[in-house]
Amino acid sequence: MLPPTVTPRLHLGLAMWANPEWRGSLYPPHGGGLEEYAQVFSTVEGNTTFYSGPPKADTVAAWSRQAPRHFRFCFKLPAALTHENRLAGVESAVDAFLASLAPLHDRLGPVMVQLPRDFGYSELPRLDALLSRWPPDIPCAVEVRHSEFFHKGMAEIALNRLLISHRVDRVMLDVRPLFSPPHDEHPGLLKAREEKPRRPLHVLSTADRPLVRFIGHYDEGLNDRCFRPWIDRLVLWIKQGKTPFLLVHTPDNRAAPALARRCYRRLCDHLPLEALGPFPGERQNRLW
């Protein structure tokens, strides 16, 4: 666990902190809160805000009490703004959403703007308008899913230039493990493949907080092979003074903590990173 005054050079985390499947491994049998999660990981995706909108004030206050100073939340802009309104006329709603997170402003990682699969080149002016008025003290990252942003043509060039001009990161969604053989019929794999877009991986850091969402498989060897190229890239970004965010998933996320630890240990073979804290659940198991 990091001392509260130390800022990580790389933030490692998962898609959530509350998952009962992690009891007995990441968490003790009756644990599973943010405070225990933050003993190990230094960031988390905030998917709850994508589906539920701005969190309540007492909820944010509780998160603020439980998360150490080095921790970073990567909340998602609500789907009501990105998918229902498609960033049109959302200025006051964006302001209200960011204001709801005010107690956590010193612990915000990139707020993720996840755009719909059909949000393409013609709608980039709306994204430009959003980023033009984005508060400079709150990091931001954009995840696109439209196929025309993955062909290295006019649309992708325009997108990347837009993000660079606003010093906003482009989310890199790595689904190679998920869609690689073996293509078995495991229900978790099938469900994850339905939910995640199958897009090429374009590795590009457009700002100072490159954000990688690594979607693993059940096959550890496959995960190792797919993660191997990330090691050199993450090392390079850190040496350039950037602070990468690595968010690790597995198909049903049951094995995500173990995969995240495995990836981090491989990075530690190449960089003098801070040690990852022991899993509270494993620590308690050893006591017994």
Where are these regions (language model features)?
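Residues lining hydrophobic/aromatic ligand-binding pockets adjacent to catalytic sites
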Residues: M1-W288
